[in-house]
Amino acid sequence: QDREARLPVKPDNQGIILWGDSVAQPTTYVLLYLHGFTASRFEGQPIISDFVKEFRVNAYLPRLAAHGLQGTEAMLGMTPANLYNSAKEALVIAHKLGKKVIIMGTSTGCTLALMLGRFSQAGGCPDLIFTEY
């Protein structure tokens, strides 16, 4: 959150946590939503909110690297490596919010989700990958 606060993030484009219950504590399952290229967390709505309500799971909706920033040159610093690293970081955070991670993605988020299936450090692999498109 400190890093997010130092960046010129567009309003409502920051990463957020949706809690599956009124008590902010880890759940058995957690949903990690990875948005598509040049998109934001809103791309997956209302499916994400409905999923959280229906199954009472936590969800983490990160702002991927170089996305959601103000300015005409916001995406110029994006590379495949920093995009993938931001997805790996999101997976580590998701593992703190629940015991088993379900990844849902759209477009480029789907590609990142599949790549995370091989990620085994600091939190391990996701337990389920679901792609919208």
Write out the residue ranges for each language-model feature.
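Catalytic nucleophile-loop/oxyanion-hole region of alpha/beta-hydrolase
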Residues: L69-I102
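N-terminal targeting or regulatory segments adjacent to alpha/beta-hydrolase or S9 domains
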Residues: Q1-R3
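Short, surface-exposed "cap/lid" segments of acyl-processing enzymes
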Residues: P8-A65
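Extracytoplasmic/secreted proteins, especially bacterial periplasmic and envelope-associated proteins
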Residues: E43-P46, N82-E89, T111
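Active-site nucleophile loop of the alpha/beta-hydrolase fold
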Residues: I129-Y133
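Gly/Ala-rich beta-loop-alpha elbow adjacent to hydrolase catalytic centers
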Residues: A94, M104-A113
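Short glycine-enriched nucleophile-adjacent loop
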Residues: C110-A122
